Swiss-Prot record:
Glycans are attached at residues 187, 218. The keyword rRNA-binding does not apply. It comes from Rattus norvegicus (Rat). Its main location: secreted. The modification 4-carboxyglutamate is found at residues 46-47, 54, 56, 59-60, 65-66, 69, 72, 75, 79. Residues 41-85 form the Gla domain. GO terms for cellular component: extracellular space. PROSITE patterns: ASX_HYDROXYL, EGF_1, EGF_2, EGF_3, EGF_CA, GLA_1, GLA_2, TRYPSIN_DOM. InterPro entries: Coagulation_fac-like_Gla_dom (IPR017857), EGF-like_Ca-bd_dom (IPR001881), EGF-like_dom (IPR000742), EGF-type_Asp/Asn_hydroxyl_site (IPR000152), EGF_Ca-bd_CS (IPR018097), GLA-like_dom_SF (IPR035972), GLA_domain (IPR000294), Pept_S1A_FX (IPR012224). This is Coagulation factor X. The vitamin K-dependent, enzymatic carboxylation of some glutamate residues allows the modified protein to bind calcium. Keywords: Blood coagulation, Calcium, Cleavage on pair of basic residues, Disulfide bond, EGF-like domain, Gamma-carboxyglutamic acid, Glycoprotein, Hemostasis, Hydrolase, Hydroxylation, Protease, Repeat, Secreted, Serine protease, Signal, Zymogen. Inhibited by SERPINA5. One of its GO terms (biological process) is proteolysis.
Length: 482
């Protein structure tokens, strides 16, 4: 009896739905009362199935935990959830200047490219010296949150306030290989001077050995074998114009030269103080590429004045620096030009944080070998100060730095002492060191030790200003105070 009644009621409902003007659709609540279904997420079988994004979060509204079951990764889940919960905040591409947008809940984050900052990377970052050297060609310093560029002596600042230009035919710090003309500048930096006694004793010292070896203390002769290491020997030949600042100190007895030097301007040569103990009288040759051949580019200059640092220590090689004033000025040309002197702060922050510097000279090709007849150059990496200190039992003072290879058989050797260590920055070479000493030549685990030029820039400058007036007949040894 009950069944026919239910059927009758169903017919009435259906008939009423089909009457004209009545909708064939009913709302969700009424429909659920008519056709009920079990939601899959609540069933036992659904819970044990692996998460499915479409089933969990598209067909149904899901929770963060359900989305996490699908991605099984917090970062990916968060990235999806931020968009799922309130839409993609990055859809409008709010980040400017190629910034990368990351969506968040009700917000977004921009990761800006170098040189931009701000919420939307809309702000241009001021380029200070730590970023691309402030776009300066040479020296850079910061002043009132802005960059001030300047140039080495012999250059002037361009109209852009960044570039360094020169009208000199051979400016300092420029290699002249393949160039018809280049220029030089009387390069100076910050430095100081003073005088001292006549040249001390004329003991013959052996450059680039350790201080104690020079004094015959704990002297050990290296074993001669076929594996003798090669240093600037292991380097490459300097072609014409590649090492124009190289000078060679030689005596009548040592025509091949006993030490090197760096041309700073037409009158001054930078060298090592310990070189002054190897000959009572010597001359300076510039423009030489091969000591056995003359090509017309060599020039010999007599020394008018010798300026040695009065704190030079012969037992430790601390303050190993000296200046030579020439009687006649150097004529600069393709193969003869000075290296630039840097500014102290800029050099220590920028130059000496470069990966490598360059040394050159006529030094021995092996630890116990002969002097090289040709001028050689070699790129040597700067060595961390702590690493260098741990490599030797000798003192590495604040006036020294280390460069070279731990195992590679290349180094500076005897005869290279006093020679240039220069560092390149934007095609300009600046003096950064003086070849001073080392334990043997290119021994494994040992590095070359160099006088740190930035520690003496004021001394150098004042030394070059110390002597005014006509030259004297005999060389004089003066001594600027530090």
């Amino acid at each position: 009896m009950e069944s026919p009644v239910r059927l009758s009621l169903l017919y009435v409902v259906l008939a009423s739905l089909l009457l004209p003007g009545r909708s064939v659709f009913i709302n969700r609540e009424r429909a659920n009362n008519v056709l009920q279904r079990i939601r899959r997420a609540n069933s036992f079988f659904e819970e044990i199935k692996k998460g499915n994004l479409e089933r969990e979060c598209v067909e149904e509204i899901c929770s963060f935990e359900e989305a996490r079951e699908v991605f099984e990764d917090n970062e990916k889940t968060t990235e999806f959830w931020n968009k799922y919960e309130d839409g993609d905040q990055c859809e409008s591409s709010p980040c400017q200047n190629q910034g990368e947008c990351r969506d968040g809940l009700g917000s977004y984050t921009c990761t800006c490219t170098e040189g931009f900052e701000g919420k939307n990377c809309e702000l241009f970052v001021r380029k200070l010296c730590s970023l691309d050297n402030g776009d300066c060609d040479q020296f850079c310093r910061e002043e009132q949150n802005s960059v001030v560029c300047s140039c080495a002596k012999g250059y002037f600042l361009g109209n852009d306030g960044k570039s360094c230009l020169s009208t000199a035919p051979f400016p300092c710090g420029k290699t002249n290989k393949g160039r018809a003309k280049r220029s030089v500048a009387l390069n100076t930096s910050n430095s100081e001077p003073d005088p001292e006694d006549l040249m001390p004793d004329a003991d013959i010292l052996y450059p680039t050995e350790s201080p104690s070896e020079l004094l015959n203390l704990n002297k050990t002769e290296p074993e001669a074998n076929s594996d003798d290491v090669i240093r600037i020997v292991g380097g490459q030949e300097c072609k014409r114009g590649e090492c124009p600042w190289q000078a060679l100190l030689f005596s009548d007895e040592e025509t091949d030269g006993f030490c090197g030097g760096t041309i700073l301007n037409e009158f001054y040569i930078l060298t090592a103080a310990h070189c002054l103990h190897q000959a009572k009288r010597f001359k300076v040759r510039v423009g030489d590429l091969n000591t056995e051949q003359e090509d017309g580019g060599e020039m010999v200059h007599e020394v008018d004045m010798i300026i040695k640092h009065n704190k030079f220590q012969r037992d430790t090689y601390d303050f190993d620096i000296a200046m030579l004033r020439l009687k006649t000025p150097i004529t600069f040309r393709e193969n003869v030009a000075p290296a630039c002197l840097p500014q102290k702060d800029w050099a220590e922050a920028t130059l000496m944080t470069q990966k490598t510097g360059i040394v050159s000279g006529f030094g021995r090709t092996h630890e116990k070998g002969r002097q090289s007849k040709v001028l050689k150059m070699m790129e040597v990496p700067y060595v961390d100060r702590n690493t260098c200190r741990l490599s030797t039992s000798f003192s590495i003072t604040q006036n020294m730095f280390c460069a070279g290879y731990d195992a590679k058989q290349e180094d500076a050797c005897q005869g290279d002492s006093g020679g240039p260590h220069v560092t390149r920055f934007k095609d300009t070479y600046f003096v950064t060191g003086i070849v001073s000493w080392g334990e043997g030549c290119a021994r494994k685990g040992k590095y070359g030790i160099y006088t740190k030029v930035t520690a003496f820039l004021k001394w150098i400058d004042r030394s070059m200003k110390a002597r005014v007036g006509p030259t004297s007949e005999t060389p004089r040894l003066t001594h600027p105070p530090y």
